[in-house]
Amino acid sequence: MYAKLGQLFKYRGMIIMMKKLEYFKVVLILPGNVLITIPLIIFFLTKETYSYNLINLNSVLFYISLLFLIVGLWLAIWSVRTFYNHGGDGTPGPWKPVSKLIIAGPYCYMRNPMLMGVFFLLLFESILFSSMPIFCWFLIFFIGNIFYFKNFEEKDLIKRFGEDYTNYRDKVSMFIPSLTPYNK
């Protein structure tokens, strides 16, 4: 009996480890490229044309950038944890979508809190390094995601979750948080 129980715990531990690995892959591929790889490429391609200077650490802009950093990290971490705890076998990555609509945690207040966190982190980078090219990358990424969500992801979510998603979409903003949580 104890051997079977040990096997069960070992199997469950392997499943949890595989799920954590899937989430690590999602974080590494999606936000990792948006926040690190692409800004580094932009930096190396534009370093001769633009000067990159850290902003004065005593300036108001520095504290504004810190606010973007804190809120961005908080939203991103809270969103990923909520996905992890409520997403079943799915992940935030499009290659393994969740099987049920997540309306918990930050998703009660806005439909795309994880992406909003990434937007804030890109703004943090562009302000901290006084970088117009990285700010332009933020604008391209922001507009591209709005286009993608409106024209592709929302259609898929309506197909997968039907009226539950349309009710949620009609009552919860894409990026601007509401003051009260969404209730079904």
Predicted regions and their residues:
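Membrane-anchoring alpha-helices and their flanking helix-loop junctions
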Residues: M1-A104, M116-K184
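Solvent-exposed interhelical
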Residues: Y107
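Extended, alpha-helix-rich binding/interface surfaces that flank or overlap catalytic cores
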Residues: N112
